Amino acid sequence: MADLDLAAIYLAVRDRMCAAIAAMPVADAETIVPACPDWTVHDLLAHQTSMPAALIAGDLPTGVINEWIQGLVDARRDTSIDDLLAEWRSDDAALGGLVANVGILVGDLVAHEGDLCGALGAVADRTAPESEAMLPGALAGLQGPITEAGLGAIEVRHGDRSWRTHDAEPGWSFEADPWEAFRALTSRRTADELRAAAHTGDVEPYLAVLDAHLPLPTASLGER
């Protein structure tokens, strides 16, 4: 990701999410996010606002990271949508400086933009460049678990282009545009949807790796 302007990517996605949330009916704040069924739209916004704010303030996770994340969301349970939006947009310089060095925050945000679209019934822009920019990072994040499982690389193919988890022969290669591939690799597709994708190789051991890395949904998000 060294050649990516992570701050610019993050802020562009942040601005789109803020615009979508600001324009939604008030009642939609309590809509469940299908990709994150334990969270409402309000919770999703609280997550995106609170995590960078905590890191900028030096509040680092010391235990189970998911418990730390949920604690940050819970702490903003009574904060209004308007106040959450204002907090998220309050210091672009500090925010840009943080995400320029923490690529995982950018990937998390790009994934959650798709989740927000699903919650609000909006059609995601599959041609937006951010998913393709984050795809190599999503693949690289799976290299360790795949290697530990003794499997070959995951390969994504789209036209005459391809991306791999690492420099090894692929054991599972599937066809998808970058947006769809990013959604799949960040566990936004069911096991059956992944089985149905045009592919070569044995998908089954890779499903186990993906599910252990981030549990796959048991019901389709209906994004196709």
Model-derived features: positions:
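Soluble acyl-CoA-dependent acyltransferase catalytic core bearing the H(X)4D motif
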Residues: 1-12, 16-19, 55, 63, ...
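Short, structural beta-strand-to-alpha-helix junction motif
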Residues: 40-41, 80, 177
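N-terminal "assembly arms/tails" that initiate or stabilize quaternary assembly
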Residues: 2-35, 40-46
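Conserved alpha-helical segments that form or flank metal/cofactor-binding pockets of metalloenzymes
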Residues: 41-68
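Structured surface interface patches that mediate subunit assembly and partner/cofactor docking
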Residues: 2-7, 28-37, 60-69, 97-224
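Amphipathic, well-ordered alpha-helical segments in soluble domains
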Residues: 13-20, 51, 87, 91, ...
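A short, structured beta-strand-centered segment in the mid-to-C-terminal lobe
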Residues: 73-91, 97-100
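A generic secondary-structure signal for well-formed alpha-helical elements
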Residues: 21-25, 52-59, 120
